[in-house]
């Protein structure tokens, strides 16, 4: 489905009852073809969605709430357009469910069907809210660098690496990632963590490259995949992982993770801006 046909940027009608048809899938293939991905994926990973505005009614009509986390595999053929996801979750508000397990099962079934792959779902109920973590991405901050730049569209030529020197292992972070929704033009603000093993990447060039997304239009997942591929091609690391955490919009935050080697799933801990 084309993003222009999604609910984004259109007048909103909120459903009075649960409605799975509100979910609007968008194929990943189109954006990936623009990146030169036409066959096997050069990465694997997950899109972590956190939903903070989930509520339903119990059998006695009393509202219930939970924080939901969805783990969408990167190999799924579709993503779900975020406003449609918000409207879908909103449709639970006046619908009765017998238990939190019934809510979880319904979410898993519907979102998996929309994405075309098995999506894991976790629900945190209010008595466990205190266990939800908040921390910043670990790594050496690129934002400490004092530099000039005037490039605000993605430019991989900014990426340089010391290919003639011994390989290094580094984890680098920046809070200066910004891209824009391709349908509404609204800015998406994010933090990004880059872990790699290989020729040392020039820090100033990498920060300028991250800043260069500032006027770019693309969904969160597409931007992270572009960052991953540009670094992979320009700097030739042996191992590479890119993890971004975007600020919340419409009660949802989206946190894509891409890697080319086996490693544990990153922590799903909110940062200060989320």
From Swiss-Prot:
Pfam families: QueF, QueF_N. Coiled coil: none annotated. GO terms for cellular component: cytoplasm. Its EC number is 1.7.1.13. Keywords: Cytoplasm, NADP, Oxidoreductase, Queuosine biosynthesis. GO terms for molecular function: preQ1 synthase activity. Substrate binds at residues 80-82, 220-221. It is found in: Cytoplasm. NADPH binds at residues 82-83, 249-250. GO terms for biological process: queuosine biosynthetic process; tRNA modification. The keyword NADP applies. InterPro entries: GTP-CH-I_C/QueF, NADPH_dep_7-cyano-7-deazaG_red, QueF, QueF_N, QueF_type2. Pathway: tRNA modification; tRNA-queuosine biosynthesis. Gene3D superfamilies: 3.30.1130.10. It catalyses: 7-aminomethyl-7-carbaguanine + 2 NADP(+) = 7-cyano-7-deazaguanine + 2 NADPH + 3 H(+). The active site is at 181 (thioimide intermediate), 188 (proton donor). Belongs to the GTP cyclohydrolase I family. QueF type 2 subfamily. Homodimer. Catalyzes the NADPH-dependent reduction of 7-cyano-7-deazaguanine (preQ0) to 7-aminomethyl-7-deazaguanine (preQ1). This is NADPH-dependent 7-cyano-7-deazaguanine reductase. It comes from Burkholderia lata (strain ATCC 17760 / DSM 23089 / LMG 22485 / NCIMB 9086 / R18194 / 383). The gene is queF.
């Amino acid at each position: 489905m084309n993003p222009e046909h999604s609910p984004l940027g259109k007048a909103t009608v909120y459903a009075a009852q649960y409605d799975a048809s509100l979910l609007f899938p968008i194929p990943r293939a189109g954006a990936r073809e623009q990146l030169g991905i036409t066959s096997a994926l050069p990465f694997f990973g997950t899109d972590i969605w956190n939903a903070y505005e989930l509520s339903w009614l119990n059998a006695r009509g009393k509202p219930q709430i939970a924080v939901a986390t969805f783990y969408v595999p990167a190999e799924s053929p579709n993503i779900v357009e975020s406003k449609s996801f918000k409207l879908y979750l909103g449709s639970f508000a006046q619908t009765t469910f017998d238990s939190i397990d019934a809510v979880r099962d319904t979410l898993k079934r519907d979102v998996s069907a929309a994405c075309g792959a098995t999506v894991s779902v976790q629900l945190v109920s209010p008595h466990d809210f205190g266990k939800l973590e908040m921390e910043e991405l670990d790594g050496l901050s690129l934002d400490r660098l004092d530099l000039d730049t005037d490039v605000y569209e993605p430019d991989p030529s900014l990426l340089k690496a010391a290919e003639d020197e011994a390989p290094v292992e580094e984890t680098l972070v920046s809070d200066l990632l910004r891209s824009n929704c391709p349908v509404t033009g609204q800015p998406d603000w994010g933090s990004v963590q880059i872990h790699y093993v290989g020729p040392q990447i020039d820090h100033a060039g990498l920060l300028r490259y991250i800043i260069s997304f500032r006027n770019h239009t693309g969904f969160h997942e597409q931007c992270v995949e572009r960052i991953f591929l540009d670094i992979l091609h320009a700097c030739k690391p042996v191992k590479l992982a890119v993890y971004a955490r975007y600020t919340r919009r419409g009660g949802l935050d989206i946190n894509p993770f891409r890697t080319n080697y086996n490693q544990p799933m990153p922590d799903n801990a909110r940062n200060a801006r989320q």
